[in-house]
Amino acid sequence: MNKKTVRDIDVKGKRVFCRVDFNVPMQNGVVTDDTRIRAALPTIQYLMEQGAKVILASHLGRPKGKVVEEMRLNAVAERLSELLGKRVVKTDEAYGDTVKAAIAEMNEGDVLLLENVRFYPGEEKNDPELAKAFAELADVYVNDAFGAAHRAHASTEGIAHHLPAVAGFLMEKEIEVLGKALSNPDRPFTAIIGGAKVKDKIGVIENLLDKVDNLIIGGGLAYTFVKALGHEIGKSLLEEDKIDLAKSFMEKAKEKGVNFYMPVDAVVADDFSNDANKKVVNIDEIPSDWEGLDIGPKTRELYRDVILKSKLVIWNGPMGVFEMDAFAEGTKAVAQALADAKDTYTVIGGGDSAAAVEKFGLANKMDHISTGGGASLEFMEGKQLPGVVALNDK
């Protein structure tokens, strides 16, 4: 990675504004999944050990520029205190005189968590005044929030213009793993693209067709490709306006010598519910009033074989409606194949795929699980991420 990291600067005695991604699920004022908090610990602990005064900033949810009581970060501060074994001071604002006073009280190795940065309308607008106000709190800026790196916000991009700006360890790992996959992959390189909508994955498919050996398609978006081949798909998800695009993707794959894998059978149901009647049919035999909600057993075997023969696999998007147990088998089979693939480097592209490997208890068998759904998607589209671009070059 050609960006400076926390290793490249001296932080002893300095106030370090560290943007993290603590956008964690909460219920009744308690953090229900602390994965993202844990992911930031190596950077936080390193800064503490180096004698920095660590000022943490994060968003939580979508308060839309105003204070929403249940989106305060108090519960996050409590959980972080437990994980660090040290009291974390939490302020009720994210900048201003009371925050400056709290920072003035800090000793080397202390940790302070600012209030939810999205309580201020200027955050998502990347307001230069707010960016300056954040910068006034610190001597150094560290961005460890890969999950927000695709956003040009005041705390992810604007602030970096006012302070020495470097990447944290999580940001560094994300960029290195995804960067190597896209620029210098081990082969055979397979991408598995699922999810509901073709339109959400157009950029990714376009970019990956130039890089992969195998492209595997699943999830709701597969039915637009099935339709493009001239098959009837019943009531399955269809994007009429993307049929021609699906055709062109398949043609491009052929031109480039990319193996393009699509479902050969499907689990169909007579209703979108866990209790619906369901059956397995060949992909060209979907009944007119049924809908495909998962890949079938023949497809699972086919995809498993491709995965086991690959040296690198990136997975983004589920194979079916895995939130319903009746239609989770396809997604589970892919997760299991990745777990069983011993000589394969497995990269899970955040979002639903990350949730799926967690759900099936296979997360610890994956080589890299991205912490950013949207950010990893844009990175895989070949886009520059504003939060990364703004950091100092080596």
UniProtKB/Swiss-Prot annotation:
Q: Which residues carry this modification: Phosphoserine?
A: 183
Q: Which Pfam families match?
A: PGK
- MF (Gene Ontology): ADP binding; ATP binding; phosphoglycerate kinase activity
- Primary location group: cytoplasm
Q: Does the keyword Cytoplasm apply?
A: yes
Any one of the GO CC terms: cytosol
User: What protein does this entry describe?
Assistant: Phosphoglycerate kinase
Organism field: Anoxybacillus flavithermus (strain DSM 21510 / WK1)
Record gene name:
pgk
